[in-house]
Curated annotation (Swiss-Prot):
Residues 39-44, 135-176, 231-237, 296-324, 414-415, 488-492 are extracellular. It is a multi-pass membrane protein. Glycans are attached at residues 151, 313. It holds the Pfam family Aa_trans. This is Transmembrane protein 104 homolog. It comes from Caenorhabditis elegans. Belongs to the TMEM104 family. The chain crosses the membrane at residues 18-38, 45-65, 114-134, 177-197, 210-230, 238-258, 275-295, 325-345, 393-413, 416-436, 467-487. Keywords: Glycoprotein, Membrane, Transmembrane, Transmembrane helix. InterPro entries: AA_transpt_TM (IPR013057). Residues 1-17, 66-113, 198-209, 259-274, 346-392, 437-466 are cytoplasmic. Coiled coil: none annotated. GO terms for cellular component: membrane.
Length: 492
């Protein structure tokens, strides 16, 4: 989990390519829930909330970059101490971002143990929600491909998958069957084998993502032009605030991966301004996707791609496009699931080491004792015994929990909008807002008191006033309260 990699040796790319990676990271499958949220909450409230949420997300992203520069200065000073390098003095150059320091490692550098554990737990719960969304979206898409196409608000999970099928095979039964198939047959072997995304899969998913979103915007626009608006969402509906806010946070989530994308950039000139431009482009993209969908379809599905699979166009070309859009979440999320699962396992192991450090030390002592007692064993016997000793309860329990809990949530509900709103509203708020605020506050203090040098203007977030941290914290707190009130059924 903790790895600082020199960008000069791990591969670099131009700033333009890096910004494109940031764009691709932000525009993920969370965008598929936005059109439904727009239609539920109203177009004016949605535009206002999404704009404000995007701005707050951008402020938090600049905090992560500033903390990253301080982390690089800390590592630079550590290297000078280790190698007794007195030639290079402390200065602005030590804050240059040349080493990749993950958010988890920055938390270990700057935060207290309580804040560190909070950060890890927030990331863990967020990743749990992420996996639950994945293991809901893929099976629901597969179920809609297999079952009769219904594009209406009257469809129920208890409806039969096909009229000619046995009554027991309802849409929910088929969905749950696909949940088990997806997790046990497809994803579990990849997680056990430790398969991660290759370059070719990354290129394929990026191209399919761009093609899918462009097709959805184009088809919805064409439908509006030819048939007019099928729905007339209100300007605002505060009862839809909860789902909208959660989806807005989820749709702009990128902070946990910023170090991996920013560090390899060959030049980081005006990086804050250019990332602001990326956020602006993403915002326009989201508005176009969501507004066209909210008005073009009478009933927007919680997985937006399903609206096109269920439309009235039956020509050969449209059928190919519809099946591609229906398969799009299956392709992209299946390739990402093992990465999220392995990241979650790593975070669990780190928290275990933080909370129970003595367990590892005791195991080491036992291994040393065993080696003294059984020095006469053969190499094969010693190797087999060590492998058995190294396998603890956690090694079996953690992967089981990682897959079992999100799968259980997916078996309970197929409401992807609900899962996205809860994941974005609670753990998502911590990952996107709370952790960056904690990091930048501690990093600035560390730069002044330990490094004895302020963060250079080039690496400074444009939002230096403590008021911004208070504002983000207040916004996050207010929003979580609103979401909670909506979830318990309070009317506004």
């Amino acid at each position: 989990m903790q790895s600082n990699t020199d960008s000069s040796t791990s591969g670099t790319y131009s700033q333009t390519v890096g910004l494109l990676y940031v764009f691709n990271l932000i525009v993920g499958t969370g965008a598929l829930a936005l059109p439904k949220a727009f239609q539920t909450a109203g177009w004016l409230l949605s535009i206002t909330l999404l704009t404000f949420s995007a701005f707050m997300s951008y402020v938090a992203a600049t905090f992560v970059i500033e903390a990253l520069s301080v982390a690089n200065a800390v590592l630079s000073k550590k290297r000078r101490v280790e190698y007794d390098d007195v030639v290079v003095a402390d200065g602005p150059s030590t804050f240059e971002i040349s080493k990749k320091v993950e958010v988890s490692e920055m938390a270990s550098m700057f935060l207290s143990k309580v804040s560190l554990v909070f950060s890890y737990f927030a990331i863990i719960i967020y990743l749990f929600g992420d996996l639950a969304i994945y293991s809901t979206t893929v099976p629901k898409s597969a179920m809609n491909i297999v079952c009769a196409t219904i594009n209406a608000s009257t469809v129920k999970s208890s409806d039969p998958c096909h009229e000619s099928w046995p009554e027991i095979l309802t849409r929910m039964t088929v969905y749950r069957f696909f949940v088990i198939i997806f997790v046990v047959v497809v994803c579990l072997p990849m997680v056990i084998a430790g398969i991660t995304k290759t370059r070719h899969i990354q290129i394929m998913t990026t191209l399919s993502r761009w093609a899918a979103f462009i097709l959805m915007i184009s088809l919805a626009t064409m439908q509006l032009s030819s048939d007019g608006a099928a729905a007339h969402p209100p300007a605002y509906n505060f009862h839809g605030f909860g789902s909208l806010f959660g989806c807005a946070v989820y749709a702009f989530m990128c902070h946990h991966s910023i170090p991996s994308l920013i560090t390899p950039m060959r030049t980081k000139d005006n990086v804050f301004g250019k990332i602001a431009l990326v956020y602006g482009v993403v915002g326009v993209f989201y508005f176009t996707l969501s507004l066209t969908g909210a008005f073009a379809f009478e009933h927007v599905q919680d997985i937006y791609t399903l609206n096109f699979f269920h439309d009235g166009n039956t020509s050969f070309i449209y059928s190919i496009i519809d099946y591609f859009l229906a398969l799009f979440p299956i392709i992209t999320l299946t390739s990402s699931y093992p990465i999220i699962a392995l990241t979650l396992i790593n975070n669990f192991n780190v928290v275990k080491d933080i909370l129970c450090p003595k367990v590892g030390q005791e195991n080491e002592s036992l291994l040393e004792a065993d080696s003294l007692v059984e020095d006469n064993d053969t190499d094969d016997e010693r190797e087999a015994r060590n492998a058995r000793n190294e396998k603890s309860v956690f090694d079996v329990l953690v992967p089981a929990l990682v897959l079992a809990l999100p799968t259980f949530l997916s078996l309970l509900t197929d409401d992807m909008l609900l899962l996205a709103s809860i994941t974005g509203s609670f753990p998502g708020v911590a990952v996107q807002f709370a952790i960056p605020c904690l990091l930048v506050t501690a990093a600035r203090k560390h730069a002044r008191s330990v490094l004895n040098f302020p963060v250079p203007r080039k690496n400074n977030s444009p939002f230096q006033s403590p008021i911004w941290i208070v504002l983000i914290s207040s916004w996050a707190g207010f929003s979580m309260i609103m979401v909670l009130l909506n979830l318990v059924g309070v009317k506004f």
